[in-house]
Amino acid sequence: MFKRSGLFAGCFGKCIRTYPAPAERISSPVLRLVVLFTHTVNLNRSFLTANDCSARANWFLFLNYASASCEHDSACRADNQFSHFDSIQRYS
């Protein structure tokens, strides 16, 4: 997980604030599986077509690459201009 001031201080951190905790932070094995399943379904559904901030944030949350928080609303809006694969190249 990168620091808040790192590479992911844009769109992803802002959107992830409202998402559930990553699976490794959840103590219950059943809830952990539910979270992983949910993120897997969302990932498969939006992998090729996601252009919105929250869908891409979900992708990075699933991979544990996203920042924990972000105050840059303009960065989130600007990042909506990039495609899913552009975002992967841009932030990896």
UniProtKB/Swiss-Prot annotation:
It is found in: Host membrane. Its main location: host cell. The keyword Membrane applies. Keywords: Host membrane, Membrane. GO terms for cellular component: host cell membrane; membrane. Cor may interact with phi-80 receptor on inner- or outer-membrane of E.coli cells and inhibits the absorption of superinfecting phi-80. This is Adsorption-inhibiting cor protein. It comes from Enterobacteria phage phi80 (Bacteriophage phi-80). The lineage of its organism: Viruses, Duplodnaviria, Heunggongvirae, Uroviricota, Caudoviricetes.
